[in-house]
């Protein structure tokens, strides 16, 4: 499994294809990231590469973290991410990870924290249908029945109800890389990605999950 890269979502825009159709895209400032640690099967029980992204002030880093980061470079980094790999021989501590690791036309999986929408009702949070708006109805956006009475006499866990909407770590898979600007460390991704502008996202090569029986999809 190859490693990914950390970046910052800048916002959305649009590009035009050969036929003149507008294609919505997301701009991501990806990297440069620094390799901060290499984990091996002998010492750690598994092989992994840890990278860091984003500068941090000295007052926000404690002494153990500072000692760990200074082993790979002079700059203190704010965000760390670890990627499992088969072997770490092709990486060295202090190496730079940039957008050059990706290619135009490649599919990627992007993880981030979705935009929080606060306390939301049934219609907005789950897409439930509303009740009649006229003819004397008093059930416009109410939930309706949430379960039986005597049996089971309670609401089962996991029942879809009103509550906090968004603000969770999610992954959007199979997004297409349309353009790469290695001078500005930019990735242009087709479609939307999790998070609001300015949020940190994790971009990694698309992980193809096999179907039942081990067949590739």
From Swiss-Prot:
Sample GO molecular function, one term: rRNA binding
Presence of the UniProt keyword RNA-binding in the record: yes
Gene Ontology biological process terms, A to Z: translation
Entry annotated with the keyword rRNA-binding: yes
InterPro entries reported in the protein's UniProt record: Ribosomal_uL3 (IPR000597), Ribosomal_uL3_bac/org-type (IPR019927), Ribosomal_uL3_CS (IPR019926), Transl_B-barrel_sf (IPR009000)
Top-level lineage group: Bacteria
Keywords attached to this entry: Ribonucleoprotein, Ribosomal protein, RNA-binding, rRNA-binding
Residue ranges of the region described as Disordered: 127-162
Entry GO terms, CC: cytosolic large ribosomal subunit
Coiled-coil region list: none
Bias-annotated ranges (Low complexity): 142-153
Complex formation: Part of the 50S ribosomal subunit. Forms a cluster with proteins L14 and L19.
Annotated HAMAP family: Ribosomal_uL3_B (MF_01325_B)
Family in the record: Belongs to the universal ribosomal protein uL3 family.
Known function: One of the primary rRNA binding proteins, it binds directly near the 3'-end of the 23S rRNA, where it nucleates assembly of the 50S subunit.
Name of the protein described by the UniProt record: Large ribosomal subunit protein uL3
Organism: Prochlorococcus marinus (strain MIT 9312)
Origin organism lineage: Bacteria, Bacillati, Cyanobacteriota, Cyanophyceae, Synechococcales
Gene, per the UniProt record: rplC
């Amino acid at each position: 499994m190859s490693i990914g890269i950390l970046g910052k979502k800048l916002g959305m825009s649009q590009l035009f294809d050969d036929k003149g159709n507008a294609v919505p895209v997301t701009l991501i400032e990806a990297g440069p990231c620094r390799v901060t640690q290499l984990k091996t099967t002998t010492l750690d029980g598994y092989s992994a590469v840890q990278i860091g992204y984003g500068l941090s002030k000295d007052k926000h880093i404690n002494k153990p973290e500072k000692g760990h980061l200074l082993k790979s470079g002079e700059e203190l980094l704010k965000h760390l991410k670890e990627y499992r790999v088969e072997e770490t021989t092709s990486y060295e501590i202090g190496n730079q990870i940039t957008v050059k690791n990706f290619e135009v036309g490649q599919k990627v999986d992007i993880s981030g924290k979705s935009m929080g929408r606060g306390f939301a009702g049934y219609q907005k949070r789950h897409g439930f249908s509303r009740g009649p708006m006229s003819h004397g109805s008093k059930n416009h956006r109410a939930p309706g029945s949430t379960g039986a009475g005597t049996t089971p006499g309670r609401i089962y866990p996991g029942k879809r109800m009103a509550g906090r909407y968004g603000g969770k770590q999610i992954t959007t898979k199979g997004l297409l890389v349309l353009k790469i600007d290695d001078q500005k460390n930019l990735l242009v991704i087709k479609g939307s990605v999790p998070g609001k502008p300015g949020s940190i996202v994790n971009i990694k090569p698309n992980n193809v999950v096999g179907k039942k029986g081990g067949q590739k999809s």
